[in-house]
UniProtKB/Swiss-Prot annotation:
The lineage of its organism: Eukaryota, Metazoa, Chordata, Craniata, Vertebrata. It is found in: Nucleus. Pfam families: KRAB, zf-C2H2, zf-C2H2_6. PROSITE patterns: KRAB, ZINC_FINGER_C2H2_1, ZINC_FINGER_C2H2_2. The keyword Repeat applies. GO terms for cellular component: nucleus. This is Zinc finger protein 43. PANTHER family: FINGER PUTATIVE TRANSCRIPTION FACTOR FAMILY-RELATED, GENE, 19965-RELATED. It comes from the Eukaryota. Residues 7-75 form the KRAB domain. InterPro entries: C2H2-ZF_domain, KRAB, KRAB_dom_sf, Znf_C2H2_sf, Znf_C2H2_type.
Length: 809
C-alpha cells in the first residue's frame, strides 16, 4: 500500500453534482476538505498544495479546476495513425461508449472510433504534441470512462468508481463512537464527527446563532441585514451569495433542451425531466420492502427507510424530540428560536423552510402545474391534486378498525382514532385544557396571549386564525363560493351551506332519547339534553347565578362589568352581543329580508317573522298549566307564569317598587330621571320609550294596518286591535280577588286594585300630593303651571269619573 495522499481522502464534484447541494452542504464540504488538508500538512504527508484547496481557500467553486481541463478539449476526430487499434463504430456495444460518440454527432468530423485495448476513448500518444483539425483523439478528461454495472453510473477516476461500489454493498464499516451512526466511507464519518466535536466560536450578534467558520457567519449575517451584493447583469436579479449568482447564470444562459409535452416546462437535464414526468403521472417505482409503501423518487425511499429501524440520533436540547436527519433537527430548532430566514421578495412574508417559500411564491405567479384529468381543475401542489382526485372516485381507503368508519385521507383517520382512545397529550399551561393536536393547542394559546397575527389589509381587523381571515375577506369582496343546488342561495362559508341544506330535506337526524324530540343539528340536541338533567355547571362569581352554557355565562358577566364591546359605527350605540349589533344595523339600512307571504309584512329578523305567522294560523302551542291560557311564544308564557306566583324580583332603588320583569323596571326608572331619549324627527316630540315613538310615528303617516273583521274598524297597533275585539266577545278575563269585579284589560285591574290597597305611587314634587294613577298626577301638575286645557265642567267629569277620562284618553 502506497503513502496516503490528499486525493485519497478528497471528494470531487462535477458541476451538476455541486448544484444539487444546498448552501449548508456546500459550506460543510469546504470546511471538511480544508480540515483534511490541514491535518495532512500537520502530519507531514501533503507536499504540494492541490488546486482544489487553492480554489476552496479563495472561496471559488470547487469544480473550477476540473473545468480548466475541459476547456482545452476540442471535438474529436479519427486519428490518421494506428487505425487498426480502434474499434469500428458499428461494433461498439457499450451504452456509455455509444453515448460518448453521440455527444459529437453534430460535429463536422466523422468516423469517431474508440481504442480497442482500453475499451474507452483515449489519447493518441503519437499526436500528443502536434494537434491539427483532423488529427486529434478524445482526451480521457473529456469522458467518464469507468462504468459500474449495477447503476451504469460513470466516473472520471478509477478511485471514484471504487468508492461508489461501496455504496451498493450496503456495508457501513465506519461507526461514530458518539451517537453510533454508521457510514460506508471514512471521509463521511470524518464529516459527521464535526457535528459532535467542533466548537461554534463565531456567534451572530443579531440572533445569537453560532457557527464554526468565519466565512459562514459572514454569509449568515446577510439574512439579517437583507444585503444582496451579487447582481446578475442579464436580468438585474440580486443574490446574497456568489454561488447563488453563479448557479442562476448557468440556469439563465443554459439551453433547456428537455421539454415536458404535457405542461410545456423545460429542463436542462433529461434526468430532471424524467423525475418531473413521474410526479405528473403519479407513478411510484420505488417500493419499501418493510411496509410496501411506494415513492416516486429513490431519495424519498431512502429517507423513509430510516423510520423502520427507529434510529433518531439527532436530539433537540430544548424539548428532547429526536430526529433521523440533522437537517430536520435544524428546521425543528427554528420553532423554538422563531427564526424565519426565507423571505418573499414580493410581499415580505417570511418562512422557516425554503420549501414553504417556494410554495408561497406560486400565489404571486399563479402557477398551477398539477392538473386533474377528470375535471380540468389545476393545483399548485401535487399533494392537493392527489386529495382532489378522491372526490371523483369517492374511494375511502383508510378504515377505522374500532368502528369501521372509512376516510379519504390518512390524516383524518389518525384524528378519528383519538376519539376512541380519548388521548389528549397536548396540555395548556395556563388553564389546563388538553388537546389532541399541537396545532390546536397553538391556536388555543392565542386566546390567553391575545395574539392575532392574521390582519385584513382592507379594514385592519386582526384574527387569531388564518381561516377566519379568509372568511372575513369575503365580506369585502362579497364572494359567496358555496351555492345551494336546490334553491341557488349562496354562502360565504361551507358550514352555513351544510346547515342550509337541511331546510330542504327537513330531516332531523339527532333525536333525544328522553322525550323523542328531534333536531337538525347535534349542537342543538346537546343544548336540549341539559333541560332534562337541569345541570348548570357554569356559575357567575358575582351573583351566584348558574347557566347551562359557558357562552351564556360570558354574556351574563357583561351585565356586572357593563362591557359593551360591539359598537355601531353609524350612531355609536354599543351592545353586549354581536347579534344585537347586527339586528341594530338594520335600523340604519332599513333592510327587511324576511317577508310574510300572507299579508306582505316584512321583518328584520327571521324569529319575528316566525312569531308573526302565528297571528294568521292562530297557533298557540305554549299553554299555562295553572289557568290553561295559551300563548304563541314561549317567552310570553314565562312572563305570564309570574302572575300566578306574584313574584317580583326586580326592585326600584329610588322608590322601592318591585316588578315582575326587568324591562318594566327599566321603563319605570325613566319616571324618576325624566329622561326622554327618543325624539320624533317630524314634530320634535320626545318619548321615554322607543316603542312609544314607533306608535307615535304612525300618527304622521296615518297608517292603520290592523283591521277588525267584525266591524271594519282599523288600528295602528296590534295590541289595540286585540283589546277592541273584547268589545265584541264581551270577554273580561281579569277578575279582582277582593270584590269580584271583572275587567277587559290587566292594566284596568291593576288600577282598580289600588282602591283596595290605598296605594298612591305617583307623587307631586311641588306640593307632595299623591295619586294612584299617573294620568291624575299629570292633570294635577297643570294647577301649578297654570295650564288650562279643559273647561271647569270637563275637569269635574274627569275627576269624578276616572273611567271616562281613561276612555277620552
Amino acid at each position: 500500500m502506497g503513502p496516503l495522499t490528499f486525493m485519497d481522502v478528497a471528494i470531487e464534484f462535477c458541476l451538476e453534482e455541486w448544484q444539487c447541494l444546498d448552501i449548508a452542504q456546500q459550506n460543510l464540504y469546504r470546511n471538511v476538505m480544508l480540515e483534511n488538508y490541514r491535518n495532512l500538512v500537520f502530519l507531514g504527508i501533503a507536499v504540494s498544495k492541490p488546486d482544489l484547496i487553492t480554489c476552496l481557500e479563495q472561496e471559488k467553486e470547487p469544480w473550477e479546476p476540473m473545468r480548466r481541463h475541459e476547456m482545452v478539449a476540442k471535438p474529436p476526430v479519427m486519428c490518421s495513425h494506428f487505425t487498426q487499434d480502434f474499434w469500428p463504430e458499428q461494433h461498439i456495444k457499450d451504452p456509455f461508449q455509444k453515448a460518448t460518440l453521440r455527444r459529437y454527432k453534430n460535429c463536422e468530423h466523422k468516423n469517431v472510433h474508440l481504442k480497442k485495448d482500453h475499451k474507452s476513448v483515449d489519447e493518441c500518444k503519437v499526436h500528443r504534441g502536434g494537434y491539427n483539425g483532423f488529427n486529434q483523439c478524445l482526451p480521457a478528461t473529456q469522458s467518464k470512462i469507468f462504468l459500474f454495472d449495477k447503476c451504469v453510473k460513470a466516473f472520471h477516476k478509477f478511485s471514484n468508481s471504487n468508492r461508489h461500489k461501496i455504496s451498493h454493498t450496503e456495508k457501513k464499516l465506519f461507526k461514530c463512537k458518539e451517537c453510533g451512526k454508521s457510514f460506508c466511507m471514512l471521509p463521511h464519518l470524518a464529516q459527521h464527527k464535526i457535528i459532535h466535536t467542533r466548537v461554534n466560536f463565531c456567534k451572530c450578534e443579531k440572533c445569537g446563532k453560532a457557527f464554526n467558520c468565519p466565512s459562514i457567519i459572514t454569509k449568515h449575517k446577510r439574512i439579517n441585514t437583507g444585503e444582496k451584493p451579487y447582481t446578475c447583469e442579464e436580468c438585474g436579479k440580486v443574490f446574497n451569495w456568489s454561488s447563488r449568482l453563479t448557479t442562476h447564470k448557468k440556469n439563465y444562459t443554459r439551453y433547456k433542451l428537455y421539454k415536458c409535452e404535457e405542461c410545456g416546462k423545460a429542463f436542462n437535464k433529461s434526468s430532471i425531466l424524467t423525475t418531473h414526468k413521474i410526479i405528473r403521472t403519479g407513478e411510484k417505482f420505488y417500493k419499501c420492502k418493510e411496509c410496501a409503501k411506494a415513492f416516486n423518487q429513490s431519495s424519498n425511499l431512502t429517507e423513509h427507510k430510516k423510520i423502520h429501524p427507529g434510529e433518531k440520533p439527532y436530539k433537540c436540547e430544548e424539548c428532547g424530540k429526536a430526529f433521523n436527519w440533522p437537517s430536520t433537527l435544524t428546521k425543528h430548532k427554528r420553532i423554538h428560536t422563531g427564526e424565519k430566514p426565507y423571505t418573499c421578495e414580493e410581499c415580505g412574508k417570511a418562512f422557516n423552510q425554503f420549501s414553504n417559500l417556494t410554495t408561497h411564491k406560486r400565489i404571486h405567479t399563479a402557477e398551477k402545474f398539477y392538473k386533474c384529468t377528470e375535471c380540468g381543475e389545476a393545483f399548485s401542489r401535487s399533494s392537493n391534486l392527489t386529495k382532489h382526485k378522491k372526490i371523483h372516485t369517492e374511494k375511502k381507503p383508510y378504515k377505522c378498525e374500532e368502528c369501521g368508519k372509512a376516510f379519504k385521507w390518512s390524516s383524518k383517520l389518525t384524528e378519528h382514532k383519538l376519539t376512541h382512545t380519548g388521548e389528549k397529550p397536548y396540555k395548556c399551561e395556563e388553564c389546563g385544557k388538553a388537546f389532541n393536536w399541537p396545532s390546536t393547542l397553538t391556536k388555543h394559546n392565542r386566546i390567553h396571549t391575545g395574539e392575532k397575527p392574521y390582519k385584513c389589509e382592507v379594514c385592519g381587523k386582526a384574527f387569531n386564525q388564518f381561516s377566519n381571515l379568509t372568511t372575513h375577506k369575503r365580506i369585502h369582496t362579497a364572494e359567496k363560493p358555496y351555492k345551494c343546488e336546490e334553491c341557488g342561495k349562496a354562502f360565504s362559508r361551507s358550514s352555513n351551506l351544510t346547515k342550509h341544506k337541511k331546510i330542504h330535506i327537513e330531516k332531523k337526524p339527532y333525536k333525544c332519547e328522553e322525550c323523542g324530540k328531534a333536531f337538525k343539528w347535534s349542537s342543538k340536541l346537546t343544548e336540549h339534553k341539559i333541560t332534562h338533567t337541569g345541570e348548570k355547571p357554569y356559575k357567575c362569581e358575582e351573583c351566584g347565578k348558574a347557566f347551562n352554557h359557558f357562552s351564556i355565562l360570558t354574556k351574563h358577566k357583561r351585565i356586572h362589568t357593563g362591557e359593551k364591546p360591539y359598537k355601531c359605527e353609524e350612531c355609536g350605540k354599543a351592545f353586549t352581543q354581536s347579534s344585537n349589533l347586527t339586528t341594530h344595523k338594520k335600523i340604519h339600512t332599513g333592510e327587511k329580508f324576511y317577508k310574510c307571504e300572507e299579508c306582505g309584512k316584512a321583518f328584520t329578523q327571521s324569529s319575528n317573522l316566525t312569531t308573526h305567522k302565528k297571528i294568521h294560523t292562530g297557533g298557540k302551542p305554549y299553554k299555562c298549566e295553572e289557568c290553561g291560557k295559551a300563548f304563541n311564544q314561549f317567552s310570553t308564557l314565562t312572563k305570564h307564569k309570574i302572575i300566578h306566583t306574584e313574584e317580583k324580583p326586580y326592585k326600584c332603588e329610588e322608590c322601592g317598587k318591585a316588578f315582575k320583569w326587568s324591562s318594566t323596571l327599566t321603563k319605570h326608572k325613566i319616571i324618576h330621571t325624566g329622561e326622554k331619549p327618543y325624539k320624533c324627527e317630524e314634530c320634535g316630540k320626545a318619548f321615554k320609550l322607543s316603542s312609544t315613538l314607533s306608535t307615535h310615528k304612525i300618527i304622521h303617516t296615518g297608517e292603520k294596518p290592523y283591521k277588525c273583521e267584525k266591524c271594519g274598524k282599523a288600528f295602528n297597533r296590534s295590541s289595540n286591535l286585540i283589546e277592541h275585539k273584547k268589545i265584541h266577545t264581551g270577554e273580561q278575563p281579569y277578575k279582582c280577588e277582593e270584590c269580584g269585579k271583572a275587567f277587559n284589560y290587566s292594566s284596568h285591574l291593576n288600577t282598580h286594585k289600588r282602591i283596595h290597597t290605598k296605594e298612591q305611587p305617583y307623587k307631586c314634587k311641588e306640593c307632595g300630593k299623591a295619586f294612584n294613577q299617573y294620568s291624575n298626577l299629570t292633570t294635577h301638575n297643570k294647577i301649578h303651571t297654570g295650564e288650562k286645557l279643559y273647561k271647569p265642567e270637563d275637569v269635574t267629569v274627569i275627576l269624578t269619573t276616572p273611567q271616562t277620562f281613561s276612555n277620552i284618553k
